């Protein structure tokens, strides 16, 4: 396992953490993975479980996860067409990581939200030009 060196730019992903974030990072991918951990889902099921995601964004995120081998898309030749998504073996290997993220969020959510509420808004911080 390579050590994470923030100044190492020799390889695109010199740090395994950066690579993992590239695969499952962003606002939606970890939520998609979390919901697929409980079993196979159709597109609209995932959409209902993550109501703030747009149809276009869900399509893009599912496609990226499929390209990376994290999820499997099964297309059934039916009318109307039926498509189901499930975790691959590689995707299932992320379950402990996603579960750890869930646990961390459950433990620390309240404290972080309190800190955010008490933070000084960025727009009210003095800058050199406002003095």
Regions found by a protein language model. Give the residues of each.
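C-terminal regulatory/oligomerization modules of transcriptional regulators
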Residues: 1-12, 67, 72, 89-131
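N-terminal helix-turn-helix DNA-binding core of bacterial DNA-binding proteins
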Residues: 8-57, 77-78, 84, 115
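Residues within the DNA-recognition helix of helix-turn-helix
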Residues: 61
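Beta-hairpin "wing" of winged helix-turn-helix
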Residues: 66-86
